[in-house]
Design a protein with these regions (language model features):
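C-terminal amphipathic alpha-helix
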Residues: 3-79, 105-176
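Extended alpha-helical coiled-coil "stalk/arm" regions
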Residues: 80-90
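Acidic/His metal-coordination segments adjacent to aromatic residues that form catalytic metal sites
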Residues: 94-105
């Protein structure tokens, strides 16, 4: 089934996968934002010596981290569906634009997995720090992971910006 325009076609499978992928991406952004807020709250609990609340929040964040990973995996499946439909998109300019957009989003998902893994490591280190402080070596690991998380966030934001520009170009082409 195709959505037809004069000299233009976009497979319904592509459009459906794009919509599902968009919803997943929004959920990932929301969950990741919540994790950043929790990190601030954990730091506050640390300053207040409230280890039980910090540990509780860290446990919740480790579960949220798994949820983000699962959502990113589902997003990659939607990107695969979109990629399979690309050869059937007309005109060629739209096909080329969306191929670039999908490639950018695949790169973004790859960075997202790395970002999420750094977060997981950070929460695990903080869990050790609060539950077994005698095993906690130093704050260098925390500082390193926060720096890596920030690097990945910058890369993800840049890829997202490029993706949005490219997908907007695709939309302009097919909606002319």
């Amino acid at each position: 089934k195709l959505v037809l325009f004069p000299g233009k076609s976009v497979p319904a499978e592509f459009t459906e996968a794009r919509l599902r992928g968009s919803g997943l991406a929004q959920a990932i952004v929301s969950l990741s934002g919540d994790s950043l807020k929790s990190l601030d709250q954990i730091a506050k609990y640390d300053r207040q010596y409230n280890t039980s609340e910090a540990l509780l929040l860290i446990s919740k964040e480790l579960m949220r981290n798994r949820e983000i990973s699962q959502s990113a995996l589902r997003l990659s499946s939607e990107l695969e569906r979109m990629a399979r439909a690309i050869p059937y998109i007309l005109p060629a300019a739209a096909r080329n634009s969306v191929a670039t957009a999908v490639s950018l989003e695949v790169a973004l998902v790859s960075r997202l997995f790395t970002y999420n893994d750094y977060f997981r490591q950070l929460f695990e280190i903080l869990q050790i720090r609060f539950s077994r402080p005698w095993e906690y070596a130093s704050g260098k690991e925390v500082a390193f992971l926060i720096a890596k998380i920030n690097e990945e966030a910058k890369s993800i934001n840049e890829l997202d910006r490029q993706f949005n520009e490219t997908i907007a170009e695709f939309d302009r082409i097919v909606n002319q």
